[in-house]
Amino acid sequence: MKLGRYLAVSKDLAPAKFIIAKCIEVEEFKGLELNELWEIHNKVLKKVDFDNFDFNDLEYVKPNLLDLKVEIAKNIFKNCHFCEHRCYVNRETERGFCRIKESYYSTEFLHLGEERVLVPSHTIFFCGCNFKCVFCQNWDISQVYFDKTIPNHCIPYNPKEMAKIIKHKRDYSKNVNFVGGDPTPHLLSILKTLSYLDKNIPVVWNSNMYLTVEGMHLLKGVVDVYLTDFKFGNNECGERLSKVKNYFDIIKRNHLLIKDEEVIIRHLVMPNHLDCCTEKIFDFISKNLDNAVVNVMFQYRPEYKAKEYPDINRRLTYEEIEKALELAEKYNLDLIYD
């Protein structure tokens, strides 16, 4: 059954992957170079089958795989390449494309507006983003570091305190859902949070998926469900409307890296973009991602700077909605709904 493991973790019938990662011992890595850390990481990860663990197998050890991931993320943070902007700045003192140094968040709450299988979802909204989408509907938090006209009400993020909040709300939530903006620039903070968290809960990575391969490797063995936002079916639309290069190539690659994981793909249908984007995305999913379920979303409205772009300066027509549904049927997608 698709999403079967997630459902088991959500009901406390199976351990979350980050819990398992804390039970996988690694050799002492203090003082090692980044390439040496990766060598240990990849060697250990190849041997682990996360589906073969139950609660009887669990015993926390030190140092463990999650500790190692945190250490690798600390190294990357100082020469940042979590995402494909690959700024290579030391974020302790410098700002890259996303303008984010330490992590801030806007809010956290039990979200009832996600997909039915996810709610109630304990959703943590990080401030900032590695995209500059001209149509962003969460622009007040995603674009706060880019646009000085947006009031900044972001809250300093403390991983240890957030772990306590997640634990407290677990009785009422099916999962913890890291989103933004985008969570990618906050990957170090998220891994630290999970290292403090001792409550079994599925981890949802809710992202635009513009990560580097290195960023993707850090997520492997930690994330239970990838909730991905697949926006464009070509590189040109990605660069024009989200200001990122090689969009389609990178997002395809990253989805192929998680083709054996549990994945929910969201696609926001946009006016005038069914041929260039929607159909191309559906075709790719149909040919490559058997495990994925898809949420075709029709709630597009021209937000933020969309009025400056004539092709997306309106809502969808009935005909466009109907065509998108016909395409989903044509490509035999496994649909999921809000």
Curated annotation (Swiss-Prot):
It holds the Pfam family Fer4_12. Its cofactor is [4Fe-4S] cluster. SUPFAM superfamilies: Radical SAM enzymes. [4Fe-4S] cluster binds at C129, C133, C136. InterPro entries: Aldolase_TIM, MJ0674-like, Pyrv-formate_lyase-activ_prd, rSAM. Binds 1 [4Fe-4S] cluster. The cluster is coordinated with 3 cysteines and an exchangeable S-adenosyl-L-methionine. The keyword Iron-sulfur applies. CDD domains: Radical_SAM. One of its GO terms (molecular function) is catalytic activity. Keywords: 4Fe-4S, Iron, Iron-sulfur, Metal-binding, S-adenosyl-L-methionine. Residues 111-334 form the Radical SAM core domain. This is Uncharacterized protein MJ0674. It comes from Methanocaldococcus jannaschii (strain ATCC 43067 / DSM 2661 / JAL-1 / JCM 10045 / NBRC 100440).
